[in-house]
Amino acid sequence: ENGIAAFTGDGTNPTVMEMATKAIGAAGGCGVPTIKPWNIDTIREKMAQAKASGCFAVAMDVDAAGLPFLKNMTPPAGSKSVEELAEIVKLAERPFIVKGVMTVKGALKAREAGAAAIVVSNHGGRVLDQCPATAEVLPEIAAALKGTGVKILVDGGIRTGVDVFKALALGADGVLICRPFVTAVYGGGEEGVKCYIVKLAGELAD
């Protein structure tokens, strides 16, 4: 109703993707399933689930390869080369979003692989301790991708309409917000989410 799409997650438990894609399907495809950087066979399986949901785009949080809890896990996860990413982009058969970009070099690699968009994100600081804030690296990444057609999204502590304004001013095309929406859902259900959206819109308009 408000033009906001959900980014859903993935995990070592297969039910995470199953429930996420089920929810996206129930919402008429208004969601972006995010796949971890597993091995290619697992990615194919997850991608099939994602596409079956009718989603309008698919994402991969490539930085998740560095998450401590994924080490020595099954299925295995790991970093992806430009060539591997390009293969995954083709599998998606719809706009593909590379999440977890924190450098100009990474942004240009995503573009080379055929990504339609990137998410400037440090995974909440859980991949690399004491890494830069997304606001610190966003301007140079935005400058590097200017005129390429690649959309730039950003996350990282965005809570208010003023935060959204700052992100847009620094070069983002859009933002990702997580925790406040979770709080709104647990505190007030659907009505809580509506109230938070109204609050965001009002702050941004002001």
Sequence positions of predicted segments:
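Short beta-strand and adjacent tight-turn residues that come in two discontinuous sequence segments
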Residues: 9, 120, 177
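Terminal peptide-recognition signature
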Residues: 60, 118, 167
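Charged helix-capping and loop-helix junction motifs
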Residues: 75-78, 132-138
